[in-house]
Amino acid sequence: GGGFSRYSTDGQWLVPHFEKMLYDNSLLVMAYIKAYGSTGRKMYGCVAEKILEYVRRELTDSQGGFYCGQDADSDGVEGKYYVFTREEIREVLGEKAGRDFCRQYGITGHGNFEGRSIPNLLENDNYEEICEEPWGNGDHGGNICHGSCDTIGGRENEECRRLYQYRIDRARLHKDDKILVSWNSWMICACAMAGAVLGEEQYVDMAVRADAFIKSHLVKEGRLMVRYRDGDAAGEGKLDDYACYSLALLELYRVTFRVDYLKRAAAWAEIMTEQFFDRERGGFYLYAKDGEQLIVRTKETYDGAMPSGNSVAAQVLYRLTRITGDVIWQKVLEKQFCYLAGAMDGYPSGHSYGLLTMMDVLYPAKELVCTLSSGSDTERRRKLAAQLANLAVTAEGLTVVIK
């Protein structure tokens, strides 16, 4: 079915906590896309594509927003949706195909999880080839996996398709169908990066639709809301919402070079700085200054399940400085790093995203400026953007600007 569960519950990485979350899968797409762009290793690109196919199929609202995730339980039993008995496999696939499938994916009579089996490739030496195979479920993946399998691979993917349908018919998982600005922003970044590196417009389209959803449903009176569900947008936007959404718009600019994305990113970053930034000591507060009046306005710097709002804000400020050359952004960025420096020095592993941004600042960066005549048509600009987008995402320390 694609997608990553939250974490492993054992040292063998066999039994997951079966819940799947949008933010985990967003960050993993970006990691795999970076790995693929750096190494050219096919498996990394395939894994990213299969995550995105899972998100498109299971976690995407009809209007383009992304849901939070899927629960671990079905019919009150954790993991029931994902496990099989050997008899079920043979019943669905037939005796011979079922026997071969069980051998391939480690499905046994005694099982590996409460008497049933979690299909896995832990003891299969061909795991990398299998991971590179496209799905045979009628869905169209990207150009990395598509058409790469041989006859055996095609047969196995047909078997996976049949088992996937059987699994859906047997029991469906509950979805957390809230749509959060910050989580959606990370998936927008992931889709945009994947589209640029893999050369697949469909992933950029997913990012564009999600942005349009936020713009239409999660902005009230010029300010961001936190979440949307069943026609209702609620919660005043916090630092994470403004920082992550600004970053998502900058990522869309980086892969499309449409100036409106850059302008909107700068506009949201201005609100973020005005409402959340501590101009005396540096750092961004978690809550806006015109929001609910609290006894203490807190700041958070350490990365948890997702990068901290302060670290993401630093990345936004860095990109705006590089792209626009505006000293206003540079001054705020310098003060931000003065604030973050002590925390990053004292607990480096808890501030990895901030450290990555600091590396961007400290190591010499290059700028590639491409100019088009004022009469250049939209199609010519689009083609140039597509050619440069891969370079903009994969090349470390490079800023690409079209003028």
Task: Describe the residue ranges of each PLM region.
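Glycan-recognition and catalytic cores of secretory/periplasmic carbohydrate-active enzymes
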Residues: 1-403
